[in-house]
Regions:
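Conserved hydrolase catalytic core segment
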Residues: 85-122
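Hydrophobic, aromatic-rich cap/lid helix
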Residues: 168-189
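Solenoid-repeat scaffolds in large eukaryotic assemblies
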Residues: 143-149
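Active-site loop/oxyanion-hole signature of alpha/beta-hydrolase fold enzymes
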Residues: 41, 50-89
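A short beta-to-alpha transition loop/helix N-cap that caps and shapes the active-site region
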Residues: 117-126, 157-160
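Short, charge-rich amphipathic alpha-helical segments embedded
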Residues: 154-170
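Hydrophobic/aromatic side-chain positions at a characteristic register within alpha-helices
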Residues: 138-139
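Conserved HGGG/HGGXW glycine-rich cap/lid loop of the alpha/beta-hydrolase fold
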Residues: 3-61
Length: 189
């Protein structure tokens, strides 16, 4: 992986493939940069693709305190690497981040988002409870509990969560669980 330095000094890791107009892939929750990997070969036929690991994930650094503005600066640094403008594709909370980056005035040529989990009014109360419980779990160092909260919010049953806790993938999810707070910040109140 190659890296670019964001405005606050954080190293942001990315892989670059193909040639043509730049497309930056913005991954969602618990993604270390691998979520969009299957898109890269197709897009790279006609684009220069920047598939990156958002801060705190994969090989990218993480500088406290977290702020949504830092993630927008990360995308700005990638746009700089891409020559000054780019298309953005964001999945899930990465879609919310891509929209925030465009709204902040970054040089975004086009934007596409997939399954951004914005809430309707009926879910706002559930979201507030989730964010409060997530914040408490992470403050107490209970990454596994934070991951279970996320899975429950996404519709997993208690049995599914119990089974997931014994899977080989659980440790990887726990390693990224602190970034669930970052995704919550991207989605706002």
């Amino acid at each position: 992986m190659t890296s670019v330095t964001s405005k606050d000094g954080t190293s942001i890791a990315y892989q670059r493939s193909g040639s043509g107009p730049a497309v930056i892939l913005v991954g969602g929750g618990l993604d270390d940069g691998s979520e969009n990997a299957a898109l890269v070969p197709e897009l790279a036929q006609h684009h220069t693709v920047y598939n990156y690991a958002r801060r705190g994930r994969g090989e990218s650094g993480d500088t406290a305190p977290y702020a949504l503005e830092r993630e927008i600066e990360d995308i700005a640094a990638l746009i700089g690497e891409a020559g000054g403008s780019a298309h953005l594709f964001g999945a899930s909370s990465g879609g919310a981040l891509a929209l925030e980056a465009a709204a902040a005035g970054l040089a975004v040529d086009r934007i596409a988002v997939y399954e951004v989990p914005y809430l309707d009014e009926a879910m706002v109360g559930h979201w507030s409870v989730y964010v409060g419980e997530l914040t408490a779990a992470l403050a107490d160092g209970r990454r596994g509990d934070a991951l279970a909260l996320f899975m429950r919010l996404a519709g997993s049953s208690d049995d599914d969560i119990a089974a997931a806790r014994t899977s080989p993938q659980w440790a990887g999810g726990e390693a990224l669980a602190h970034t669930l707070a970052y995704d919550a910040a991207c989605l706002g109140d």
